[in-house]
């Protein structure tokens, strides 16, 4: 890692021995271990260990769960929030498990579209609800800091499964709950 940073500093015209940079390779290495720890965790295990048999058959919504991730194209952060709604069949999941699922997938190099899909598909596979919807809203620093340099753009993605995909009334109820 140190060789990588020495080359990087040289390529941008920086002095690797400058006081503020001497420990940077070590600091960044520790930071990257933290930022990308999602590769070492199994999202399915996180969900499997946190559900229980339930009697609820109405919609459950976890709204505005904050996340940050790293764009795989430019290695710059994107951050925002994710809302997940589901209608249980037999299993109800602990709310913190939803946040853990989001954290595991977001702590990897990502694109927002895949992040949204992975969360929805894993939740659908493990919890087997009658329907699940995931809505992700994010601000991408790769769009703000370079290229088109649009600082206020927000990208929204969604994935719908089961009743949320088949029934417009179910979708509308979820959207109404997000607004209230």
Swiss-Prot record:
GO cellular component: cytoplasm
GO terms, biological process: one-carbon metabolic process; tetrahydrobiopterin biosynthetic process; tetrahydrofolate biosynthetic process
NCBIfam families: folE, PRK09347.1-2, PRK09347.1-3
Annotated organism of origin: Helicobacter pylori (strain Shi470)
EC numbers: 3.5.4.16
Entry protein name: GTP cyclohydrolase 1
InterPro entries: GTP-CH-I_C/QueF, GTP-CH-I_N, GTP_CycHdrlase_I, GTP_CycHdrlase_I_CS, GTP_CycHdrlase_I_dom
PROSITE patterns found in the cross-reference section: GTP_CYCLOHYDROL_1_1, GTP_CYCLOHYDROL_1_2
Cited Gene3D superfamilies: 1.10.286.10, 3.30.1130.10
Binding site for Zn(2+): 71, 74, 142
Highest taxon listed in the record's lineage: Bacteria
Enzyme kind, highest EC tier: hydrolase
Cross-referenced Pfam families: GTP_cyclohydroI
Entry's Gene Ontology molecular function annotations: GTP binding; GTP cyclohydrolase I activity; zinc ion binding
Sequence similarity: Belongs to the GTP cyclohydrolase I family.
Key words, A-Z: GTP-binding, Hydrolase, Metal-binding, Nucleotide-binding, One-carbon metabolism, Zinc
Quaternary structure and interacting proteins, as annotated: Homomer.
Pathway assigned to this chain's UniProt record: Cofactor biosynthesis; 7,8-dihydroneopterin triphosphate biosynthesis; 7,8-dihydroneopterin triphosphate from GTP: step 1/1
């Amino acid at each position: 890692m140190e060789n990588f940073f020495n080359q990087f500093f040289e390529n941008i015209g920086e002095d690797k021995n400058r006081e503020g940079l001497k420990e940077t390779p070590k600091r960044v290495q520790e930071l990257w271990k933290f930022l990308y720890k999602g590769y070492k965790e199994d999202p399915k295990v996180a969900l499997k260990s946190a559900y229980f048999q339930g009697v609820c058959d109405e919609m459950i919504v976890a709204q505005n769960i904050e996340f940050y991730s790293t764009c795989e194209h430019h290695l710059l952060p994107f951050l925002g929030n994710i809302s997940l709604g589901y209608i249980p069949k037999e299993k109800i999941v602990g709310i913190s498990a939803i946040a853990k699922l989001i954290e595991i997938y977001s702590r990897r190099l990502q694109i927002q579209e895949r992040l949204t899909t992975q969360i929805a598909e894993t939740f659908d596979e493990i919890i087997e609800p009658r329907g699940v919807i995931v809505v992700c809203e994010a601000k991408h620093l790769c769009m703000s800091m370079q290229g088109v340099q649009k600082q206020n753009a927000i990208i929204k993605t969604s994935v719908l499964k089961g009743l949320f995909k088949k029934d417009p009334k179910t979708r509308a109820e979820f959207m109404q709950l997000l607004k209230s």
